[in-house]
Each structure stands twice: as structure tokens, then as C-alpha cells.
């Protein structure tokens, strides 16, 4: 969901920088621009780094139940979630004019073959992957209705708009605009059903993956970078109580980048 983003007024800002040399140099360069405060005391956070460090920061905030607006400056490679980096203290002016885009993580509740249950959050995607040479067989249920009785292949994933340009896109899934309020359900190297290429679901959907014959065909579940092995079932839905807000410059051509990414080669 997109929210109005002009007229921001932040008096307490946190500065977070990735450990790369370039990001550390940028942090030193803007260190005197304002009196930075710890993340827990801030009204908003400025993040220096790439998309990977931005995701780490977002997970840190989700785990701590912090809901500060986040303004990223790209000092990495792609910088899909970041704004263009420029030197100097103008970042404070840009913050005041930034527009807001709200993003919510997926909540994964996974049940292992032993019956243990664990929960994790995923900003990008949750993927189920075969653990051995045996083809994974997975039942897919959407809103308590079985949609695919048996998906045979390497696995399946459910991606948020934030994650739709990552693993999902590599698996031939669709790229979703950040404010689309949709989810991408994408098979990974499917064998059967041969013609099913995935689905785009409203982000209020509840999705369940049930592993068929899990002893013979073990499957792992990965929520971003957290992995659980020997899965029996995974239940997924958007967790709106952990919503985060990303800040983008008004001239940040995010929609153009989403379109361009689909024609990259």
C-alpha cells in the first residue's frame, strides 16, 4: 500500500552503515550532518549500503518490533530498495520530501516431520526446496481450498513484491510493483503439472504447502536466509502488525526500474 510521503518531519535519526569500505566512508562523511541517535531512540533510519544490508536492517527492525521509516542510500550494486547516493548533508532535505511505501513481511509457520513448530518472517520470499535427488511433491492450498493437489519438481516459493525481483524472478515468476498488494506463487523447476506457471494472489491470501511423502522426499523451508529441514507443512500469510515503511525520493523512478528489470538481459 502506498502512503502519502511528503512533509516528513524527523528530529531523531539513526544512521546504519554496512561494513563495506565505501559505506563506512559515506557514514563518516555525513557523521556531522546531525546528532544521530541509536536505532531504538530514532524516529527514522538512514541506511547506507546495498539491498542485502537493507534486508538485514529490516529483519532487525521486525525482530525488535520497531516500525521506523527507513531511507536507504545505495552504496551496493543493484540498490532496488535504495535511493541514489549523493555526498553531503542534503540527505536531510531529501528525507523531508520522501514518499512512503508500506511493506509487510510474510509470516511462516513451519511444522517439521517430528511435529515441532517454528515461526519466521520473510521480507523477500519463503521457498520450499527438495533436500535430495528425489523430486519434491507438494500440495498447495490457498484460503483452505486445494489448488494444486500435487506439484512435482524442485519446489515452490511465495514472494512478496519486495522479493519478486529476487529468487522469484530467477524462477520465472512475475515482478510485482511494491505497492501492488499482491503475492507471487511460483513453482521451482516444475515437472508436473507441466502447464502451470504459478499464480498472482491478493496479499490477504492464506497459503499452505503440505509435503507429500516427506520421509522419502524430504523438503526444506527457507524464509529469506533462515532454513528449516525435514518439513511436513508450511502455513503462510502477510503479517501486517510488523509493517515497515520505506522512504523514496519523489523523483525516484521506481516504476521505471520495475519495468526495466523485466527487459534486462
Name each model feature, range by range.
Residues 18, 23-24, 76-155:
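Catalytic core of DAGKc-family lipid kinases
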Residues 150-153, 157-194:
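Gly/Ser/Thr-rich active-site loops/lids in small-molecule metabolic enzymes
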Residues 67-71:
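Proline-centered loop/turn at the N-terminus of a beta-strand
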Residues 120, 128-129, 133, 143-148, ...:
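ATP/nucleoside-binding phosphotransfer catalytic cores, i.e., glycine-rich phosphate-binding loops
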Residues 63-66, 176-177, 199-201:
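Short, conserved loop/helix-junction motifs that constitute active-site signature segments
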Residues 46, 74, 126, 225:
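A residue-level signal for conserved active-site and pocket-lining positions in enzyme catalytic cores
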